[in-house]
Amino acid sequence: RDFLFANRSNYPVAHRDFRWPDLEHFNYALDWFDAELARNHGSQLALKITGAGEAERTFAQLSEASNRVANGLRALGVKRGERILLMLGNVVPLWEVMLAAMKLGAVVIPATTLLTPTDLKDRFDRGRVRHLIATAADAPKFDGLDPTVTRIAVGDAPAGWHNYDDLLKGAPSFTPDGPTRATDP
């Protein structure tokens, strides 16, 4: 990055001499979001949601909330490499879960709220989904799908589902199980 900034007005040199870093380990949520953005710009606005569900979060708030969610997900059995189907609109939990999953080394399968039960069955089967996070209103779309999948609802959790708000009760600091290899999914 510094090389590109220093050569931003000299395109031939920037193009010829730039080399991507060859990292052995890298975790965006831990190594960039928390270590750089939250630490150095914690009070600055990181997220602004307008319209229904209007909300704002700073880098520090998202960092801590994602730590809590990561700890809560870990307590529910989410492990490195497992897949989480995430079906939420543009709401704060979407961003908290994205960062939390990265911290855990879990793989997020994003899903639009427009998917039908048939579409979701396909995602479950091909994606090898182990965990699911969706709104309580969308919970009926998952009826009849793999009952062993951990189900977490944003809103009033139906029977058999965990409540997302309980994840936010996790510890405010997070320690990863180990390093994330730069080649990990």
Residue ranges of predicted features:
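Short hydrophobic alpha-helices that are characteristic scaffold elements of the AMP-binding
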Residues: L99-L104, R126
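Conserved AMP-binding/adenylate-forming core of the ANL superfamily
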Residues: S43-L99, T116-K121, D165-D166
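N-lobe entry segment of adenylate-forming
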Residues: R1-R57, Q61-R74, T148
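Conserved S/T- and glycine-rich ATP-binding loop of Class I adenylate-forming
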Residues: I84, A101, L132, P185
